[in-house]
C-alpha cells in the first residue's frame, strides 16, 4: 500500500487506499485526535442532528428516519457505515449517494487540516462526511455510530436527539464484556435535556 499523499488528480480509490495506511491501528477509540482536526475545519451542521447507536438495527433505523424526513420535505444528510459495495454509500444527501468528486474534495480538506495528526480510516472519513454535510445546508442530519458511542468519532457532534436501538454483547474487546458495560459506552451519545429514545 502506498503511504504517500494522493496528488491533485487522485481518484476516490487512491484516497481510500491511502487512508488505510495513515494510522497504525484500524480501531483506535478516542476523541482527542478527531476533535483537534475538527477544530481546524468548519463542521457547523445546520438543522436537527440525530445520532443512532446500538448493537443491532442502527442502519435500518437510520434509513427509516431518513425516509420519514425526506417524505416530510426536509433536506437530509445520512451517514452510515460500513458500506456494502461502494464507499459512497456511506454518505447520502437528499437520498442521493455522494459523488466521488464530492468525497475527494472533502478528503483533501481533511488532509490539509490534519497536519501531522494521525487519524484512523473511520475518523478521517467521518470528518470528511461531516464537512460535506456542513456545506450542504441541510435541515436534518442522521448519523450512525460506528462502534460503541462514548469514544466513537461520530460523537463529536452535539446531537439534538439520540437513539439507541438495542444493547447486546458485541465488540467486547473494546466495549466491555457485559451488557451493562456496553450500555454505558453507548449511553454516552445521549445529551442532557435532549430527547433520548431507546
Positions of predicted regions on the chain:
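Inter-motif core of Ras-like GTPase G domains
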Residues: 155-166
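Short glycine-/small-residue-rich Rossmann-like dinucleotide-binding loops
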Residues: 146-147, 166-168
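Short functional linear segments
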Residues: 1-54, 61-63, 67-72, 79
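Hydrophobic/aromatic beta-strand patches that form the interior of the parallel beta-sheet core
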Residues: 50, 77-79, 161-163, 197
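Redox-cofactor binding/interface segments in oxidoreductases and associated redox assembly factors
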Residues: 24, 143, 164, 198
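Internal gly/pro-rich beta-alpha loop/helix module
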Residues: 160-161, 174-198
Amino acid at each position: 500500500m502506498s503511504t504517500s499523499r494522493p496528488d491533485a488528480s487522485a481518484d476516490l480509490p487512491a484516497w481510500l487506499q491511502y487512508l488505510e495506511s495513515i494510522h497504525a491501528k484500524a480501531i483506535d477509540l478516542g476523541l482527542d485526535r478527531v476533535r483537534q482536526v475538527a477544530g481546524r475545519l468548519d463542521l457547523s451542521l445546520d438543522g436537527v442532528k440525530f445520532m443512532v447507536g446500538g448493537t443491532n438495527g442502527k442502519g435500518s433505523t437510520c434509513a427509516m428516519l431518513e425516509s420519514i424526513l425526506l417524505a416530510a420535505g426536509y433536506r437530509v444528510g445520512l451517514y452510515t457505515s460500513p458500506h456494502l459495495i461502494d464507499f459512497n454509500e456511506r454518505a447520502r444527501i437528499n437520498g442521493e449517494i455522494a459523488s466521488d468528486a464530492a468525497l475527494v474534495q472533502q478528503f483533501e480538506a481533511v488532509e490539509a487540516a490534519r497536519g501531522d495528526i494521525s487519524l484512523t480510516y473511520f475518523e478521517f472519513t467521518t470528518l470528511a462526511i461531516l464537512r460535506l454535510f456542513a456545506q450542504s445546508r441541510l435541515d436534518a442530519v442522521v448519523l450512525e455510530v460506528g462502534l460503541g458511542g462514548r469514544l466513537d468519532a461520530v460523537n463529536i457532534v452535539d446531537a439534538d436527539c439520540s437513539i439507541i436501538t438495542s444493547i447486546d454483547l458485541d465488540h467486547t474487546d473494546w466495549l466491555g464484556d457485559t451488557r451493562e458495560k456496553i450500555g454505558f459506552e453507548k449511553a454516552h451519545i445521549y445529551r442532557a435535556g435532549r430527547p433520548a429514545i431507546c
